[in-house]
Amino acid sequence: MGDPVTWFDLGAADEEPLKPFYAELFGWTLQPASERYTVVATGGGINGGIGRSRSGDPWVAFYVDVADPQATLDAAESLGGKTAVPLTKVSDMLTFAMFTDPDGLIVGLTKAIEGEGNGGGSVGQGAPVDWFEILGSDAKRSQAFYGELFGWTYADADPSYGLVDTGAGRGIGGGVGASGQGMRWATVYASVEDVERYLARAEGLGGRREYGPLDVDDHMQSGAVRDPAGNVFGIYHHEPH
């Protein structure tokens, strides 16, 4: 069984502008957890948080729930990654760490007591966050790295973009691949009813369009925005077959 993606975070040197941006863009419920961190309740998929960046650099990351974060950090380093944030205890119920993969993309690790913030499902409102995406420089290398690290398997599809099956039965699905346009990120996507409308709304709220709308196939459109801090956040719309 693979490890599930269960949480996301957004950070900035000044996190305050991010709160109204995401609340108004997606209709999410925000609840302050501390002076520097606000919990985001979405309308489905996984929840997340908005916090102050210790380094001052903006960042977006999703977290993978693992049995042993330190062992996973060690494994990531042996596969060509680097520790970005060492194992940190948030409370008696939660520890986390972060690493960068061979492309320098940042991904989080977490270990939580079942039902205590580790992907039990969203109870908020607004757009669901139900997809993650890793775009590196070499699809085969990225797929091998994450497959080995988290036990993920990939659907037999376009070799430049593998659909992830974590096999965990919780968390969200995603894709690992590479872009011919030079796009590099590890981020999450919100499901919306109209990609163009949300891209335009983001621009009106102080963000900018990263790409889109892009017709992925006959049933799906995608796009991405850069928030006021410069973080890339994806959006998509899927029409049922």
Language model regions located:
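A charge-rich, low-complexity, intrinsically flexible signal that marks solvent-exposed coils, linkers
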Residues: R52, A178, E239-P240
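N-terminal beta-strand motif that seeds the catalytic metal site of vicinal oxygen chelate
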Residues: M1-E16, I46, V60-F62, G108-Q143, ...
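Fold-core signature of tandem repeat domains
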Residues: V5-F8, F21, F26-L30, V40, ...
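Vicinal oxygen chelate
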Residues: P4-A13, S53-S137, A155, L199, ...
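Short acidic/glycine-enriched loop/turn segments that link adjacent beta-strands
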Residues: S34-Y37, G56-P58, V90-T95, D158-Y161, ...
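Core segments of cupin and vicinal oxygen chelate
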Residues: M1-N47, S78, E133-G171
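Structured core of small recognition/catalytic domains
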Residues: Y146, A155-G204, R208-L214
